[in-house]
Amino acid sequence: MASLTTLKNTAIVTGSFLSGAMITLSTITVPVLLETSTHPPQLLHQWVRTYHYGHISLPTISIATAILYFYIAAYQGAREQPWRKAALVGFLTIVMVPFTWIVMSSTNGMLFGLEAGNRDHSQFFEQGANRSGLKGANSSQSHGLGNVSVGIGVEMATLEGVRELLVRWKWMHLVRSLFPLMAAVLGVGICV
């Protein structure tokens, strides 16, 4: 079994890595997407793929890191040593998961919905629906943030709306990234 010091150091390193990986999504990846994508379906698809790959690894790292901190808290508590700080650090590391469900799910849902709608209807437009006059029927009518109706119940994302949603997501994600960063900073204190 690894020593307690090794577990503490591992938790700090994984938490720091987690926070760094998350912060780069808001400070590098999303800004690059916003600056280089001028076609809403492409921008949405790139965000969905970025989210997919982040979703595979980042929550897992968060949970594994929190488990390390909770183990440290239990170990120290069983030996009548200070344990609350380790438990708090574990909580701060894992709180990004419920933060996503509570704070970000609405924006995530809008982005996923727009991407799915654009994907589902792209074939319709590629097959000549625009040439048949369907797009002009009510193309200026807005139906919520990020999309516009283009006839017969089909909604397509606008670039301005998608960008607005991604900027909102970027800031919420940056806030979410601060939880494991705070945990890593506080985690250093449990190693001394």
Curated annotation (Swiss-Prot):
The keyword Glycoprotein applies. Belongs to the anthrone oxygenase family. This is Anthrone oxygenase. Disruption phenotype: Impairs the production of monodictyphenone, but leads to the accumulation of endocrocin. One of its GO terms (cellular component) is membrane. The keyword Transmembrane applies. One of its GO terms (molecular function) is monooxygenase activity. Disulfide bonds: none annotated. Glycans are attached at residues 130, 138, 147. It catalyses: emodin anthrone + O2 = emodin + H2O + H(+). It comes from the Eukaryota. InterPro entries: Anthrone_oxy (IPR013901). Coiled coil: none annotated. It is found in: Membrane. Pathway: Secondary metabolite biosynthesis. Keywords: Glycoprotein, Membrane, Monooxygenase, Oxidoreductase, Transmembrane, Transmembrane helix. Anthrone oxygenase; part of the gene cluster that mediates the biosynthesis of monodictyphenone, a prenyl xanthone derivative. The pathway begins with the synthesis of atrochrysone thioester by the polyketide synthase (PKS) mdpG. The atrochrysone carboxyl ACP thioesterase mdpF then breaks the thioester bond and releases the atrochrysone carboxylic acid from mdpG. The atrochrysone carboxylic acid is then converted to atrochrysone which is further transformed into emodin anthrone by mdpH-1 and mdpH-2. Its EC number is 1.10.3.-. It is an enzyme of class 1 (oxidoreductase). The chain crosses the membrane at residues 12-32, 54-74, 86-106, 172-192. It is a multi-pass membrane protein.
